[in-house]
């Protein structure tokens, strides 16, 4: 789970922990969360969706994601790629991602006052979206092809599944070359402070 806030509006991206664990880790009360955005149906991203709805938190997901969560489908807000969502001064535009599920989404989030923009995408084999004026980029990449190919601990079937449903490091770099990185925040040394990769290594996710 990730929190995006402008100090007035607080968005929760994903709810893949138990409801109790989410409350403990986030440092936010349920009443402080304006909305929860879910990228896709897998439990590590949507586990607490039904409980969030019961607690009064609006949950937004695609119809494909909702179809896999019958207990959330009736109450969830169904969204599509390209639709414009507004929460206070924050604007969210979902975009298509590529995973082994129905209708997965990533999110482009902009603060209308500061004009800061975040592009956020997890569990995707590729990205077709191109955005300008990005301030922050948070993209999950899961493997490097030569390391995956050499591994004798990962079954061939799983290797193929990884290749077809997750982002490879070099493909992420190619995608980044197509983006406008001129506005991405840098530190005093010129390193990209606004660029973050979620990389899975040795079965542990690090960010």
Residue ranges and their predicted role:
Residues 1, 41-45, 92-94:
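Structured catalytic core of nucleotide-sugar glycosyltransferases
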Residues 15-17, 41, 65, 97-100, ...:
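Active-site metal-binding loops of divalent metal-dependent hydrolases
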Residues 1-26, 105-123, 136:
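Conserved beta-strand hairpin/beta-sheet module of binuclear metal-dependent hydrolase folds
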Residues 57, 72-81, 89-92, 134-139, ...:
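Active-site regions of enzymes building and remodeling cell-envelope glycoconjugates
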Residues 18-64:
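Active-site metal-binding motif and surrounding structural segment of the metallo-beta-lactamase
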Residues 131-207:
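Cap/insert and terminal regions of metallo-dependent hydrolase folds
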Residues 9, 55-58, 179-186:
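A short helix->loop->beta-strand "cap" motif at the edges of active sites that frequently abuts
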Residues 83-144:
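Catalytic core of the metallo-beta-lactamase
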């Amino acid at each position: 789970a990730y929190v995006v806030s402008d100090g007035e509006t607080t968005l929760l991206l994903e709810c893949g922990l138990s409801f109790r664990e989410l409350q403990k880790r986030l440092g936010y009360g349920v009443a402080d969360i304006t909305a929860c955005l879910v990228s896709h149906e897998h439990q590590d991203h949507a586990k607490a969706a039904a409980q969030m709805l019961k607690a009064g938190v609006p949950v937004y997901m695609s119809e494909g994601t909702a179809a896999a969560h019958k207990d959330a489908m009736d109450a969830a807000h169904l969204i599509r790629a390209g639709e414009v969502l507004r929460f206070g001064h924050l604007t969210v535009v979902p975009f298509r991602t590529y995973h082994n599920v129905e209708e997965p989404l990533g999110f482009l989030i902009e603060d209308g006052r500061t004009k800061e923009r975040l592009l956020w995408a997890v569990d995707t084999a590729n990205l077709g979206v191109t955005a300008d004026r990005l301030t922050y980029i948070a993209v999950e990449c899961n493997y490097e092809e030569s390391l995956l190919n050499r591994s004798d601990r990962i079954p061939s079937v799983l290797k193929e599944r990884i290749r077809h449903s997750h982002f490879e490091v070099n493909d992420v770099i190619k995608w980044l070359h197509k983006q406008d990185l001129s506005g991405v925040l840098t530190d005093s040394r010129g390193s990209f402070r606004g660029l973050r990769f979620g990389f899975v290594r040795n079965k542990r996710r690090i960010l």
